[in-house]
Amino acid sequence: MAGNVFGQMFRITTWGESHGKAVGVVVDGLPAGLPFSEADIQKELDRRRPGQSEVSTPRHEADRVEILSGIFEGMSTGTPVSMLVWNSDARSSAYDVIKDTPRPGHADFTYMARYGMRDHRGGGRSSARETIGRVAGGALAKLLLSRFGILIAGHVLELGALRAKPLSFEEILENVEKTPVRCADLEAAEKMLEKVAALRQEGDSIGGIVELIIRGVPAGLGEPVFDRLDADLAKALMSIPAVKGFEIGAGFEAARLYGSEMNDPFRIKEGKITTSSNNAGGILGGISTGLDIVCRAAVKPTPSIGKVQQTVDLKTLENTEIAIKGRHDPTIPPRMVPVAEAMVALVIADHMLRSGFINPRTLLE
């Protein structure tokens, strides 16, 4: 299986399966001289850890990270950073009943079509548990970017038909962890919690939209034509399980606007070139403008639901039905926020190194 590596100069390789012994990541390209510890990584992993609230799976995993290489006396050495997390609460027997019946909305059928076999225990490699490696690698990317004044704020903008009101970057950072649904509009968050609770009782699930704001990115970041910054952000977010759509700035709304409405007029502010609006979402021609980069990912409802669904029996090739049991998230967006933040951090860190905005030697000066 290929496709386990992401990035060019700042590169991660994730490994492991949902019900295997462990999952982890190898990070290549982290410059020498960055102070970090297991606590820095653990802080991010704890944000995506299951079993913490009524909006996540009841699977209980400590998700304690172990750093195996790439660090000496509390600093990165410039060599590969290898990290792992042991799986401890996998209940594989719950998945025996679906061994020969592909779950609607899951990768069961497509993995069989591609590889001729699949690990049916929790989805194997296609499980969202793979994202532990992304979050661990992204934690290092976020630490690196913070040294250069780049910060990332993610939150749940929509859950089903419920949408948060417009909020500032600072409000998102302040409020996002105050509620299990990670919606920074606390009034909307309460309604979202009620909706999730009702759907859980019904054996159903709900999707939503995760919004990300990246602040502090300098103008001039990006590698046209095929390595456009927005294209790489789209790939990063679309690679996350359950993501079905991506937009940046005005996004699909841009198709409904006139040019006079969509264009962001240039002006001088405090001696610097800026724009009076940001419909472009901080990127023009695949290159950053210096304004906030604003992008969103559309997340489908959790496909594992308790309702009876139509499927097929792979052995008999007959139609049948399935009602999925086990421990599953009633909604994905809240736990996806730290994963999405990690992925965009990896993209920005990679481009900062590729463009020369980060000189690997400067961390030691």
Swiss-Prot record:
E.C. designation(s): 4.2.3.5
Organism: Methanosarcina barkeri (strain Fusaro / DSM 804)
Family annotation (NCBIfam families): aroC, PRK05382.1
Keyword S-adenosyl-L-methionine among record annotations: no
Similarity comment text for this entry: Belongs to the chorismate synthase family.
Entry-linked Pfam families: Chorismate_synt
Cofactors that this protein relies on: FMNH2
Broad class of enzyme this protein falls into: lyase
Protein name from the UniProt record: Chorismate synthase
Gene: aroC
Residues involved in NADP(+) binding: 48
Region described as Disordered: spans on this chain: 41-61
Keywords: Amino-acid biosynthesis, Aromatic amino acid biosynthesis, FAD, Flavoprotein, FMN, Lyase, NADP
Pathway in which this enzyme or protein is active: Metabolic intermediate biosynthesis; chorismate biosynthesis; chorismate from D-erythrose 4-phosphate and phosphoenolpyruvate: step 7/7
Entry-linked Gene3D superfamilies: Chorismate synthase AroC
Role noted for this protein: This reaction introduces a second double bond into the aromatic ring system.
Binding site for FMN: 125-127, 285, 300-304, 327
Domain of life: Archaea
A GO MF term: FMN binding
